[in-house]
Amino acid sequence: MKKILGVIPARYASSRFPGKPLAKIGDKTMIEWTYRNASRSSVLSELVVATDDVRIHEVVQKFGGRSVMTSSDHPSGTDRIIEVANQFSEYSIIVNIQGDEPGIEPELIDGVASLKASHPEWAMSTAAVPLLDFSHAIDFNRVKVIIDRNGKAIYFSRSLIPSQFKTTVPLYRHLGIYGYDRDFLLQYNSLPKSNLEESESLEQLRAIEAGYGIGIYLSKEAGLSVDTPADLEIVIEDFKKRKWISE
């Protein structure tokens, strides 16, 4: 059985929501909710938070989680994941779990990680969910993905893909969780930045344009993510409905 490491990148200096990982949802911080829900995964061998901020690091340690300090110079979350992967050499699959999804379902993590484990020929795995609301399909901030018959990504775009010109075909929204083959992850930054990546502002297109396979795990629903204080209020109401926090 391959050893699988889950990594939750957590930055304090978010431009739209400074201090976001430490925002309170009930009596717990958002990073604690994310960590505790991710730890319910049945396939992760280890779970760590990767942060460049000592405040986040100390909060994670205080609630009993594992945290590692990383450089503050990383231009992306992927670079932070690479630094952590270099510190944990015994893991062959690395799962990048978004720190701003406090209600993440363990089944999503299990699905993405297991898909990567069962397809060593693919460099990466990620997830998608059926896109049923057309207004969301044309939303530039919601990334769409086209999937081939073998469950592999053909292309990711912020635009509406595929076109609904002649017939209505299923639409899928990409979810920001990734399972990486360790060897591929460590060489990722040596791949040249692609024109597609620059055009769409989507890192995963670097792998696509270089000819690497990305498997897609189809999830039934997308969880709520927090980008702004307004998003946090939506999550708080959702947690109340779930009876995870009190009214």
From Swiss-Prot:
Protein name per Swiss-Prot or TrEMBL: 3-deoxy-manno-octulosonate cytidylyltransferase
Gene: kdsB
Function of the protein: Activates KDO (a required 8-carbon sugar) for incorporation into bacterial lipopolysaccharide in Gram-negative bacteria.
HAMAP family recorded: KdsB
Annotated catalysed reactions: 3-deoxy-alpha-D-manno-oct-2-ulosonate + CTP = CMP-3-deoxy-beta-D-manno-octulosonate + diphosphate
Keyword Nucleotidyltransferase (UniProt): yes
Family: Belongs to the KdsB family.
UniProt organism field: Leptospira interrogans serogroup Icterohaemorrhagiae serovar Lai (strain 56601)
Matching SUPFAM superfamilies: Nucleotide-diphospho-sugar transferases
GO BP: CMP-keto-3-deoxy-D-manno-octulosonic acid biosynthetic process; lipopolysaccharide biosynthetic process
Places the protein is found: Cytoplasm
Organism domain of life: Bacteria
Gene3D superfamilies for the chain: Spore Coat Polysaccharide Biosynthesis Protein SpsA, Chain A
